[in-house]
Amino acid sequence: MEVAEAGVDGVAGRRQQEEASGAAPFGRSSSLIGAAGFDGALRELKDLRSQLHQTADCCEKAFLDTEKKKLILESTKGYICDAIVAVIDHLGTVSSKLEQQLQEKIEITQTEKKLNFLKQRLLTCEQYAITLKLLTVRGDNDAIQYHRRYLSQSTGGTKEENGANSRKDDVKFVEYNSPTIPGAILTFKPYDIQSTIGRERSVATTDSESPTTDAKSSFSFRAEDVPIVLAEHRKKANHGSNILSFIRKGRRHA
């Protein structure tokens, strides 16, 4: 009878141990559980929490119903170790998935930064090209500096007039070849600088009796010397007329 009772107790203890061990939702190969993504890993972690609560309730019932509590405690310790390993495994999976997503976001941000850097370089190149074009336009002497409607049509005429005035200011000495006869009266026309530049004039005399008509002398002529020359010749003419009048008076008295 005692042997039969011992056998019944052994079978009951094995059944309770199997129930306690069967309550565990995972074994030591729980690290092989994979998740498709970060959301799947979080979902498995939540399911693991509910499974741990269910296993704790089963172990408590088995511990209260059986007389071999030491065996239930040992099986519960083993289950707790497996549960801790599974939880750590799930946490590692969640962290790896999270790190993977963060890495993808970092790669995206890095590519965006590279694109922005390339755009900035292109912009600097365009600005440099624009500055070079501006320098070439500034260096072009034939380029139009103002708008056409702000330019008058008399611009070219004013430039020519300014050039002519600058030429008039620079009066040159002109050489004249003319016969010089003492006592002759010289007459000059009003001078024109543009017509006299680079030309020679011969001064005609009214007295043709002198034998020195072929003698020629070159002298330089200036506009301001005209009244001086006229005054000298008038003095000589008056002196000659005075001599002639004196001779005539002497003949009359004789």
UniProtKB/Swiss-Prot annotation:
InterPro entries: ABI. Keywords: Cytoplasm, Cytoskeleton. It comes from the Eukaryota. Its main location: cytoplasm. Involved in regulation of actin and microtubule organization. Part of a WAVE complex that activates the Arp2/3 complex. The keyword tRNA-binding does not apply. Residues 1-26 are annotated as: Disordered. It is found in: Cytoplasm, Cytoskeleton. One of its GO terms (cellular component) is cytoplasm. Binds SCAR. The keyword Secreted does not apply. This is Probable protein ABIL5. Belongs to the ABI family.
